[in-house]
Swiss-Prot record:
Membrane keyword on record: yes
Membrane topology label: Multi-pass membrane protein
Cell location: Membrane
Swiss-Prot/TrEMBL keywords: Membrane, Transmembrane, Transmembrane helix
Name of the protein this chain belongs to: Uncharacterized protein YOR015W
GO CC annotations on file: membrane
Residues passing through the membrane, by range: 57-77, 80-100
Length: 119
């Protein structure tokens, strides 16, 4: 559907009051939305109703911290360049730990053994 037709449908729904009815029906159909951090139910360009979820700053900070942790782990425990990519692709440290413990057990153990002898 061309953009001007979508805009015309949206304007028609707003004019006749059907748009507000759609928003209220969606809110009633999914009651848990009111309990979460949702700003509003908005109209996107493709004519769909989507919730706009406000993501807190602490959530972004935890993602950034886990990405930094992956990067540090991959620098310390690996000599292969593709592991640096995993540091930014994996969403948590646990899969990276599994990856290191299975594929790179020998380098990990040798570094840990080296650190134990120096401390």
């Amino acid at each position: 559907m061309p953009h001007f037709k979508r805009a015309a449908v949206y304007e028609e729904q707003k004019r006749t009051g059907k748009w507000g009815q759609l928003v209220e029906e969606t809110k009633d159909r999914i009651p848990e939305y009111s309990n979460k951090t949702i700003a509003k139910i908005s109209h996107l360009d493709n004519g769909c109703l989507w919730p706009e979820i406000k993501v807190s700053f602490s959530h972004h900070l935890s993602i950034l911290q886990s990405m930094c942790l992956h990067f540090i782990i991959s620098i310390l425990f690996s000599k292969y360049i593709f592991v640096f990519l995993f540091a930014f692709l994996l969403p948590s440290a646990f899969p990276l730990f599994i990856l290191h413990s299975t594929l790179f057990r020998k380098p990990c153990l040798s570094i840990i053994g080296f650190l134990k002898t120096k401390v």
